Design a protein with these regions (language model features):
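Amphipathic alpha-helical interaction elements
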Residues: 42, 59, 81, 85, ...
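Conserved beta-strand -> loop -> alpha-helix junction used to position metal-binding or nucleic-acid-contacting
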Residues: 67-74, 79-115
Length: 243
């Protein structure tokens, strides 16, 4: 399950416009197909808000999650571990790289992105740590914040190394959530603000519904990943599942 947020501007009852975030839960089912699981809107969030979202998913029938890919949102990993104790939490690589590049001059962006890629495409945790240290040696003089942030989030970044390459390719490096965000932005780009939270949710839902018409095939590398899931989590697969 991928969790992500889109910022919108909503006019309140007092006629003041304020930023809200619409949070999207995008699931990959056992057939490897994308599915919208939930939409929520809020001005602020924290562990209590996230636990409410996850409880909503559980009450609507989402029994188990193998992997949760999330942005570095405060309180979210803890809420996931409360609602779905067996789920593995992984910080979204797309967001980590994007956040890092905010600090980088345009002329350095390509080289920095390439060196960051060496970290998250490493075959093991040990080699990833070596690449992170190498990154720090090369770039800390100009951009010390990047390696500092990655080191502070390292625990929730490295769970992917517990899985074989097939699962990593199908999940952590997929552009599923990024392509959905692009579709939403394209659909909503001409709206500067919304008269209510409901209207904002409605337009984002319509954008996702339009995008979902193309969700007819499994994501890349899914068959190989699913076979590994069946081996790693035999007791958590549906009883009628056949590889």
């Amino acid at each position: 399950v991928f969790f992500d947020g889109i910022v919108v501007h909503v006019r309140g009852a007092d006629a003041k416009v304020s930023p809200h975030t619409i949070y999207v839960a995008l699931g990959i089912d056992l057939e490897g197909k994308k599915e919208l699981l939930g939409l929520w809107i809020a001005k602020t969030e924290g562990a209590k808000f996230w636990l409410g979202c996850l409880t909503d998913l559980r009450n609507r029938g989402l029994e188990d999650i193998f992997i949760c890919c999330v942005d570095g949102l405060a309180g979210f990993p803890e809420a996931i571990r409360t609602a779905y104790p067996q789920a593995r939490v992984q910080l979204c690589l797309v967001h980590l790289v994007r956040a890092a590049l905010r600090y980088v001059a345009t002329k350095d962006a390509k080289a920095v992105a390439a060196d960051l890629k060496k970290i998250y495409t490493s075959p093991t945790v040990a080699s990833a740590e070596e690449q992170l240290e190498e990154f720090a040696k090369v770039w800390d003089a100009k951009y010390p914040t990047i390696s500092k942030q990655w080191k502070s989030k390292w625990t929730d970044m490295i769970s992917m190394f517990d899985f074989p390459e097939e699962i990593r390719r199908a999940t952590y490096t997929t552009n599923a959530i990024e392509s959905l965000n692009s579709a939403i932005r394209k659909f909503t780009k001409n709206r500067k603000q919304y008269p209510s939270e409901h209207s904002a949710l409605k337009l984002v839902y319509m954008a996702i519904r339009e995008a979902s018409k193309r969700w007819t095939r499994p994501i890349k590398h899914w068959k190989q990943a699913l076979n590994h899931f069946a081996i790693l989590f035999p007791d958590r697969m549906p009883k009628d599942y056949q590889a």
